[in-house]
Amino acid sequence: MTDTETRLKALMLRGLDGDTAAYREGLALLGVRLRAYFMRRMSGAPGDVEDLVQETLLAVHLKRSTWDSAQSFTAWAHAVARYKLIDHWRRRKIRQTLPLEDHVDFLADDAPDPGVALELDRALASLPQRQRMLVSDVKLTGLSLAEAGARAGISEGAAKVALHRALKALAERMRRADG
């Protein structure tokens, strides 16, 4: 148990027993921790930090009877804070993203089998140039059918048909490679 946990838990227990000064001190200490927590997560909106701190402190006050004193107080308070932050993001329609670099190890496990990648490269190479270019532009690069068609010098409709045929041919070649 950390010093902060020990101190906060003791203050909150005393506060629940009616010690107003201890309760006020506990909320003040928790407020400092909450500010730091929200500042790390709300770097783009520092004005919202104080609102979140106040909302969380109010929720802690209103829901204090749900805290099991046999459990960690800081873990319970952190959960309340996290839910308040998520509610804030939902109200503001904010989608929080995490840097991809944080998940490199996790993603590495899902890396494609090099043998499959080689077979796919071979299958792509066997397609006519226009079809290969359409597959690359639309499926790998992310261009729209209209953009890929313009690059290939054909209409969007023709690009759609050619892409469909190319994907069908690729699927057939990959099935034969597996069989």
From Swiss-Prot:
Loss of function: phenotype: Not essential even when cells grown in the presence of dichromate or cadmium (CdCl(2)). Loss of dichromate and cadmium induction of the regulon's genes, including partial loss of its own expression. A double sigF-nrsF deletion is viable, whereas a single nrsF deletion (for the cognate anti-sigma factor) cannot be made.
Pfam families: Sigma70_r2, Sigma70_r4
Highest taxon, organism lineage: Bacteria
Region (Sigma-70 factor domain-4): 123-170
Induction info: Slightly induced by dichromate, partially dependent in itself for expression, does not depend on sigT or sigE. Probably part of the sigF-nrsF operon.
Tagged with keyword Plastid: no
Motif Polymerase core binding positions after renumbering to this chain: 51-64
Keywords, alphabetical: Cytoplasm, DNA-binding, Sigma factor, Stress response, Transcription, Transcription regulation
Residue ranges for the DNA-binding region feature of this UniProt entry: 145-164
Main localization (coarse): cytoplasm
Cellular component GO terms, alphabetical: cytoplasm
UniProt keyword annotation of Transcription present: yes
MF (Gene Ontology): DNA binding; sigma factor activity
GO BP, sorted A to Z: DNA-templated transcription initiation
Subcellular location: Cytoplasm
Matching InterPro entries: RNA_pol_sigma-70-like (IPR039425), RNA_pol_sigma-70_dom (IPR014284), RNA_pol_sigma70_r2 (IPR007627), RNA_pol_sigma70_r4 (IPR007630), RNA_pol_sigma_r2 (IPR013325), RNA_pol_sigma_r3/r4-like (IPR013324), WH-like_DNA-bd_sf (IPR036388)
Region feature (Sigma-70 factor domain-2): 33-93
Annotated family: Belongs to the sigma-70 factor family. ECF subfamily.
NCBIfam families hit by this protein: PRK12539.1, sigma70-ECF
Function noted in UniProt: Sigma factors are initiation factors that promote the attachment of RNA polymerase to specific initiation sites and are then released. Extracytoplasmic function (ECF) sigma factors are held in an inactive form by a cognate anti-sigma factor (NrsF in this case) until they are released. Up-regulates expression of 4 operons (sigF-nrsF, CCNA_02834, CCNA_03001 to CCNA_02999 and CCNA_03363 to CCNA_03366) in response to potassium dichromate (K(2)Cr(2)O(7)) or cadmium chloride (CdCl(2)). Overexpression of sigF leads to higher expression of its regulon.
Name of this chain's protein: ECF RNA polymerase sigma factor SigF
Organism: Caulobacter vibrioides (strain NA1000 / CB15N) (Caulobacter crescentus)
